[in-house]
Amino acid sequence: MKQSIIQALRKEFETLEMKSGEGVFDYFSRVMSVANKMRVHGKQMRDVTIVEKILRSLSDKFNYIVCSIEESKDSDLLSINELQSSLIVH
């Protein structure tokens, strides 16, 4: 049972994408909600996994910001809060 819940949450996490017109805060809330559910059920979710997922799944209007972040910062060292702050500023 637990494994099937984790599998369902993993699929939900992998298919998450920012919706057209969705704000940064709302998208981060959706991603973190799924990630936290996975953690509750025993799945290890490193921050870098979440940061990379968010960078890959933002809407096209953030492409130039994502490129800038990837060039200037090591995504392994970027916290979720730092990423959110960087995106909100833009």
Question: Whereabouts are the PLM-identified features?
Answer:
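Intrinsically disordered, low-complexity linkers and tails enriched in Lys/Ser/Pro/Gly that lie
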Residues: M1-H90
